[in-house]
A protein has these predicted regions:
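Beta-sheet entry/capping signal
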Residues: 6-9, 45-47, 78, 219
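Betabetaalpha-Me/HNH-type nuclease active-site subdomain
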Residues: 32-125, 197
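A positional/structural detector of protein chain ends, strongest at the extreme C-terminus
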Residues: 1-4, 282-284
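C-terminal, well-folded lobe of enzymatic/effector domains
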Residues: 23, 115-116, 120-284
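Cleaved targeting-peptide boundary
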Residues: 21-32
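Cleavable N-terminal signal peptides of Sec/SRP-targeted secreted and luminal proteins
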Residues: 3-22
């Protein structure tokens, strides 16, 4: 059992690790933060910043249950944030480093509007805060041993900052890789676009459905002092594919091209179907 610290702030006792809660004031808000007292098995090597493609995430959500619907971001053809994941090389996790430090919506209130736009809970019918709560409890509480992440506000703010700096929408578009329901792309071209822009090896994840590779997520990695670095060595469902002499970290089937789908809402599809039916009726 970790050491007990009797302090004016808060008494905390955790297995294998001890923390002290303190507070800091920023922009008029009282933010809870975490000060590390000891280190433990929850240590990690890298931070993985994961961006997801909303159209594919929506497709996967609907696949689980045909009654599911999606809450898409305002810009449906823009990459959104999934999370920032502390990771130990060759292992999964750490995760859930402090189950007593629950997600508190008040801590991210100043940036909530921004989060709703780019760190979107696509799963309609679930709580607005369910994704943020999950990411904070599972990953944020582990990242919090670093000063740059030792509060909810800092953790989620860093996600916003990294998205602005490393937007996959901008990186891919600058290489003429854009969402399309008719054109597909080679995985090596997607990897090359990211690698040439950032100078590091990303992880590219696909979801396979109906015999097609759908791009799902792109992950980039950072050292604990927040310097971008290669993702080599992370343990995910990743295959080190060698394509034309290039090593690519991906689970995408290299024998086929990748679909980067443009999102088409169900309501728009129904409207189009009705319009086409009406036009056919006019020509009778």
């Amino acid at each position: 059992m970790g050491t007990l610290f009797l302090l004016p702030s808060v008494l905390i006792s955790l297995t294998c690790i001890s923390y002290i809660y303190t507070a800091e004031i920023a922009n008029g808000y009282d933010f809870k933060i975490l000060r590390r007292v000891t280190t433990n098995r929850h240590d990690f090597d890298l931070l993985i910043f994961t961006q997801q493609w909303p159209a594919t995430a929506c497709k996967e959500w609907k696949k689980k249950d045909h009654s599911h619907s999606c809450s898409m971001p305002p810009k449906v053809d823009s990459w959104s944030i999934h999370g920032i994941w502390p990771t130990k090389l060759g292992e999964m996790g750490p995760s859930f480093c402090n189950r007593t430090w629950l997600f508190d919506p008040e801590q991210i209130r100043p940036i909530e509007d921004q989060l709703e736009s780019v760190w979107v809970n696509i799963f309609a019918g679930t709580s607005l805060y369910s994704l943020w709560s999950h990411e904070w409890t599972k990953h944020g509480t582990c990242a919090a041993v670093l000063d740059k992440f030792n509060s909810e506000f800092k953790y989620f703010s860093m996600g916003l900052e990294w998205l602005q700096q490393y937007s996959m929408s901008n990186i891919l578009q600058s290489n003429n890789i854009v969402p399309s329901n008719t054109q597909q792309y080679a995985i090596e071209d997607i990897n090359k676009a990211v690698k040439e822009k950032l100078g590091v090896d990303p992880v590219i994840e696909c979801k396979k459905e109906d015999g097609e590779n759908y791009i799902s997520e792109i992950r980039i990695c950072f050292t604990k002092d927040l310097k971008i670095t290669n993702c080599d060595g992370v343990l995910f469902p990743v295959v080190y594919s060698n394509i034309d002499g290039e090593s690519i970290l991906t689970n995408c089937d290299k024998s086929m091209k990748v679909t980067y789908p443009h999102y088409v809402s169900t309501s728009w599809t129904v409207h189009l179907h009705s319009l086409l039916s009406w036009l056919r009726w006019l020509t009778l």
